[in-house]
From Swiss-Prot:
Pfam families: Ribosomal_L1
Tagged with keyword Membrane: no
Gene Ontology MF terms: rRNA binding; structural constituent of ribosome; tRNA binding
GO BP field: regulation of translation; translation
Highest taxon of the lineage: Bacteria
NCBIfam families: rplA_bact
Listed GO CC annotations: cytosolic large ribosomal subunit
Family the entry assigns: Belongs to the universal ribosomal protein uL1 family.
Job of this protein: Binds directly to 23S rRNA. The L1 stalk is quite mobile in the ribosome, and is involved in E site tRNA release. Protein L1 is also a translational repressor protein, it controls the translation of the L11 operon by binding to its mRNA.
Source species taxonomy: Bacteria, Pseudomonadati, Pseudomonadota, Gammaproteobacteria, Alteromonadales
PANTHER family in UniProt: 54S RIBOSOMAL PROTEIN L1, MITOCHONDRIAL (PTHR36427), LARGE RIBOSOMAL SUBUNIT PROTEIN UL1M (PTHR36427:SF3)
Protein name as annotated: Large ribosomal subunit protein uL1
Record gene name: rplA
Disulfide bonds, paired cysteine numbers: none
InterPro entries: Ribosom_uL1_bac-type, Ribosomal_uL1, Ribosomal_uL1-like, Ribosomal_uL1/biogenesis, Ribosomal_uL1_3-a/b-sand, Ribosomal_uL1_CS
Length: 233
């Protein structure tokens, strides 16, 4: 058996894997166990009661967290004309059409989010094999294909998170940094859960939000008691 690191031993001693933690207790535990030499992200895994094999039960979308994610987000926008000027004014780092596509083909990928106006999709469509595997392909469901690119840029900068269930029906995303206050992390988590509930597929049956766990980048998952969250039903 592999030898446990000191950190893993402490986590095993502190975290009860069979327990649902009140949200404030869960956050306090994460902060106590966050001993990495960098400011760790706080990640969430939400198990949904869906059948991910069926396309009409897949959950995908985006929501702006009230306190952001703590990350500086670099945005690339495919658009032209007045929309290009609006995107720059909103804070986009990269704006263009064919010229931007050529940069990406050359391997210049210094951005975290890609946004496109509908008329630019003819250009973006040719980048599917590059952007797709990286989760960067613009999509109307996540608000990244839109006529109002300026608003999309502002949302991305304000701490918008995009979510999509994996093959096991689990949503993985980030809700902030470990140096956020407990209130900020709680309200960000509540905003995400509320958005997921609004995105519930009409055909999904039974319990929809089955389990909510939070963790830091280097830590173990802590299961949250949903009754201690203030979310829309």
């Amino acid at each position: 058996m592999a030898k446990l690191t000191k950190r893993m031993r402490v986590i095993r001693e502190k975290v009860d894997g069979t327990k649902l933690y009140e949200i404030n207790d869960a956050v306090a535990l994460l902060k106590e166990l966050a001993t990495a030499k960098f400011v760790e992200s706080v990640d969430v895994a939400v198990n949904l009661g869906i059948d991910p094999r069926k396309s009409d039960q897949n959950v995908r979308g985006a929501t702006v967290l009230p306190h952001g994610t703590g990350r500086d987000v670099r945005v690339a926008v495919f658009t032209q004309g007045a929309n290009a000027e609006a995107a720059k004014a909103a804070g986009a780092e990269l704006v263009g059409m064919d010229d931007l596509a050529e940069q990406i083909k050359a391997g210049e990928m210094n951005f975290d989010v890609v946004i496109a106006s509908p008329d630019a999709m003819r250009v973006v469509g040719m980048l599917g094999q590059i952007l797709g595997p990286r989760g960067l392909m613009p999509n109307p469901k996540t608000g990244t294909v839109t006529p109002n690119v300026a608003e999309a840029v502002k949302n991305a900068k304000a701490g918008q998170v995009r979510y999509r269930n994996d093959k096991n029906g689990i949503i993985h995303t980030t809700i902030g940094k470990v140096d956020f206050t407990p209130v900020q992390l709680k309200e960000n988590l509540e905003a995400l859960i509320s958005a997921l509930k609004k995105a519930k597929p009409a055909v999904a049956k039974g319990v929809y939000v089955k389990k909510v766990s939070i963790s830091t980048t280097m830590g173990a998952g802590v299961a949250v008691d949903q009754a201690t969250l203030d979310t829309a039903n």
